[in-house]
């Protein structure tokens, strides 16, 4: 796997969620992602970036345009130093929410991408890495 370009984008306030969506849309377009796949990726970004702000107290989105077997993709890691997720199994259940949301953020995001990895612990923050291939 090779990495073409990468960077970090702050996700500290609600406005950063919009900017993260715009950045990822551009990255996906530049690597030739089909509109349907681009839309799925941007929707997942919206959910995860919003969770980073609302539940994680803000954090960062690390991004990379990558290639594997001549297939480009976008890999994103959302990380925060918030309270973490005490029960991952429960959090990954459709309809469950720790706040006022619909409870579709994590499970919805997972369904919209090709790869989804969640690393969290109470008091240690949360790190979610997603990848969408073209």
Model-derived regions, located:
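ATP-lid-like helix-loop hinge signature
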Residues: 52-72, 77
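Solvent-exposed beta-strand sheet faces enriched in polar/charged residues
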Residues: 62-64, 79, 119, 131
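Glycine-rich/acidic phosphate-handling loop/turn and adjacent ATP-lid/helix
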Residues: 68-102
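Conserved ATP-binding N-box helix of the HATPase_c
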Residues: 35-61
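Flexible, glycine-/charge-rich segments associated with ATP-binding catalytic modules
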Residues: 1-14, 110-134
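Glycine-rich phosphate-binding loop
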Residues: 98-114
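Bergerat-fold GHKL ATPase/HATPase_c domain
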Residues: 1-43
């Amino acid at each position: 796997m090779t990495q073409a370009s990468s960077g970090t984008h702050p996700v500290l306030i609600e406005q950063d969620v919009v900017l993260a969506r715009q950045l990822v849309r551009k990255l996906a377009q530049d690597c030739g992602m089909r509109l349907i796949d681009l839309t799925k990726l941007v929707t997942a970004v919206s959910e995860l970036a919003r969770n980073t702000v609302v539940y994680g107290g803000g954090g960062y989105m690390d991004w990379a345009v990558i290639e594997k077997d001549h297939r480009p993709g976008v890999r994103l890691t959302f990380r925060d130093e918030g309270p973490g997720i005490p029960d991952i199994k429960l959090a990954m259940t459709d309809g469950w929410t720790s706040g006022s949301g619909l409870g579709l953020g994590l499970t919805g995001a997972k369904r919209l991408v090709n790869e989804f990895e969640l690393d969290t612990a109470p008091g240690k923050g949360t790190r979610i890495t997603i990848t969408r291939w073209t």
